[in-house]
């Protein structure tokens, strides 16, 4: 099992299991005048880390997946929710290779920008009086 592979790794095991660790920890925070909620897989108070466990079809492409699936937004929100740095522990579904991916300042900044834009869109669609979503379109230059 993939779980067994992760837990057989001493560093992973120490990050996941210790006396100062909480699991499936919920939180709510107000950012950009909207409430955001999340549930962290693991909050490790000893190491001051929020840890998310992910599987991937190809660990060599995880950095691309992290952008495609907005993991930068997740890392930004959860780091603000819990006040700790964010770490992804990833296991390849095919090879069972384990990866640990920490987050650069640029990764958090991209996440912050996406969260800000999402808040702006939410405000437009749900907080703007008489807004007609049928009249909404995006306009870009190629």
Regions found by a protein language model. Name each.
Residues 22, 70, 94:
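Electrostatic, structured charged patches in enzyme active sites and in nucleic-acid/phosphate-binding
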Residues 38-63, 78:
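Conserved catalytic cores of phosphodiester-cleaving nucleases, focusing on short active-site segments
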Residues 1-39, 135-142:
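Metal-dependent nuclease catalytic cores that hydrolyze phosphodiester bonds in DNA/RNA
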Residues 34-35, 69-71:
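Short, glycine/acidic-rich beta->alpha junctions
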Residues 28, 56-58, 93-95:
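Short, solvent-exposed loop/turn segments at secondary-structure junctions
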Residues 64-67, 77-142:
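Metal-dependent nuclease catalytic regions and adjoining charged, substrate-binding loops involved
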Residues 33-37, 44-48, 84, 95-96:
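Coil-to-beta-strand transition motifs
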């Amino acid at each position: 099992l993939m779980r067994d592979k992760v837990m057989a790794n001493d560093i992973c095991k120490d990050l996941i299991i210790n006396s100062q660790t909480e699991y499936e920890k919920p939180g709510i925070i107000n950012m950009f005048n909207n409430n955001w909620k999340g549930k962290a897989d693991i909050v490790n108070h000893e190491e001051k880390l929020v840890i998310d466990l992910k599987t991937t079809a190809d660990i060599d492409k995880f950095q691309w997946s992290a952008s495609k699936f907005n993991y930068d937004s997740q890392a930004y929100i959860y780091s603000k929710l819990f006040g700790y740095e964010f770490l992804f522990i990833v296991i390849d579904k095919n090879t069972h290779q384990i990866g640990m991916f920490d987050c650069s300042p640029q990764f958090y900044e991209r996440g912050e920008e996406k969260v800000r834009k999402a808040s702006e869109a939410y405000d437009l669609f749900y907080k703007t009086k008489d807004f007609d979503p049928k009249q909404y379109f995006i306009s870009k230059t190629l």
